[in-house]
């Protein structure tokens, strides 16, 4: 109360002088000191959420979106998932498997054709295994024999006259025909006249044809 009274008395006598700063000290600096003491509390209460939060650019995605984008990358797509790639990889061997199947069918077809060709060659023992080269050579020899028969208009004879030559020789067609000469000529049927009916079945090499071949 003395301060208030002195303030009023001083103010009444000295109007031209400014008030003494000490008179206003309790009012000016008292609240300031309290605010100074309470400032850390308010700063911690107001600024702690902002300080604790990580710095993100303005308008950026939330933390969960940013973490997901960093984990998968900008080019991550559903079509590039591991399961999708494994499914695509499992289809590649299937495409490559069509080649061996086609080759196997082609080989089986060729083997079947050679088996049918071997059956058409006469006088080949059943237990004889012919290679493809021998099969082609015997078939060529038999075709040449049939062409000679048709060219000379000879009578059909015994198919035993044609012998499958299984040994490898260096001679020509004439030497083969001489070696294929039957040991018993009397076993062949006699030559028939022009008006007689020809014997059905596979054509053979008649005795007259052999004689003509040997006399040449």
Swiss-Prot record:
**Metal-binding: present as a keyword of the record?**
no
Supply one GO molecular-function term: protein homodimerization activity
Q: Which residues carry this modification: Phosphothreonine?
A: 107
- Phosphoserine PTM positions: 109
| Domain bHLH, chain residue ranges per copy | 94-146
UniProt region (Disordered), positions on chain: 1-20, 53-109, 165-203
Q: How does it assemble?
A: Efficient DNA binding requires dimerization with another bHLH protein. Forms homodimers and heterodimers with TCF3 gene products E12 and E47, HAND2 and HEY1, HEY2 and HEYL (hairy-related transcription factors). Interacts with MDFIC. Interacts with SOX15; the interaction enhances HAND1-induced differentiation of trophoblast giant cells.
Mind telling me which PROSITE patterns this protein's record contains?
BHLH
Ranges annotated as biased composition (Basic and acidic residues)? 165-174
The gene designation is Hand1
Q: Which InterPro entries match?
A: bHLH_dom, E-box_TF_Regulators, HLH_DNA-bd_sf
| Name of the molecule in the record | Heart- and neural crest derivatives-expressed protein 1
* PTM annotation, UniProt: Phosphorylation by PLK4 disrupts the interaction with MDFIC and leads to translocation into the nucleoplasm, allowing dimerization and transcription factor activity.
An example of a Gene Ontology cellular component annotation for this protein is: nucleolus
State the compartments where it is located. Answer: Nucleus, Nucleoplasm; Nucleus, Nucleolus
Organism field:
Mus musculus (Mouse)
Q: Which domain of life is it from?
A: Eukaryota
**Mainly localized where?**
nucleus
Comp. bias regions, Basic residues: 8-18, 92-104
Low complexity: bias regions: 65-78
Supply the alphabetized keyword list: Activator, Developmental protein, DNA-binding, Nucleus, Phosphoprotein, Transcription, Transcription regulation
Pfam hit, one: HLH
Q: Which GO terms describe its biological process?
A: angiogenesis; cardiac left ventricle formation; cardiac right ventricle formation; cardiac septum morphogenesis; cartilage morphogenesis; cell differentiation; cell fate determination; determination of heart left/right asymmetry
Q: What does this protein do?
A: Transcription factor that plays an essential role in both trophoblast giant cell differentiation and in cardiac morphogenesis. Binds the DNA sequence 5'-NRTCTG-3' (non-canonical E-box). Acts as a transcriptional repressor of SOX15. In the adult, could be required for ongoing expression of cardiac-specific genes.
Tissue/organ expression: Smooth muscle cells of the gut and adrenal tissue.
């Amino acid at each position: 109360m003395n301060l208030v009274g002195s303030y009023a008395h001083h103010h009444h006598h000295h109007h031209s002088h400014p008030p003494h700063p000490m008179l206003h000290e309790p009012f000016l600096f008292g609240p300031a000191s309290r605010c100074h003491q309470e400032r850390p509390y308010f700063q911690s209460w107001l600024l702690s959420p902002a300080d604790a939060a990580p710095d993100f650019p303005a308008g950026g995605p939330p933390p969960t979106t940013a973490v997901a984008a960093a984990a998968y990358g900008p080019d991550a797509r559903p079509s590039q998932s591991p399961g999708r790639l494994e499914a695509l990889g499992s289809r590649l061997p299937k495409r490559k498997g069509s080649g061996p199947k086609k080759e196997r069918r082609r080989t089986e077809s060729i083997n079947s054709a050679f088996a049918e060709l071997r059956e058409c060659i006469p006088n080949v023992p059943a237990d004889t295994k012919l290679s493809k080269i021998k099969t082609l050579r015997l078939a060529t020899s038999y075709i040449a024999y049939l062409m000679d028969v048709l060219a000379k208009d000879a009578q059909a004879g015994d198919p035993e006259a044609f012998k499958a030559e299984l040994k490898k020789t260096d001679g020509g067609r004439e030497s083969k025909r001489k070696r294929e000469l039957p040991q018993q000529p009397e076993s062949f049927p006699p030559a028939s006249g022009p008006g007689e009916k020809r014997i059905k079945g596979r054509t053979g090499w008649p005795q007259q044809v052999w004689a003509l071949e040997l006399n040449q």
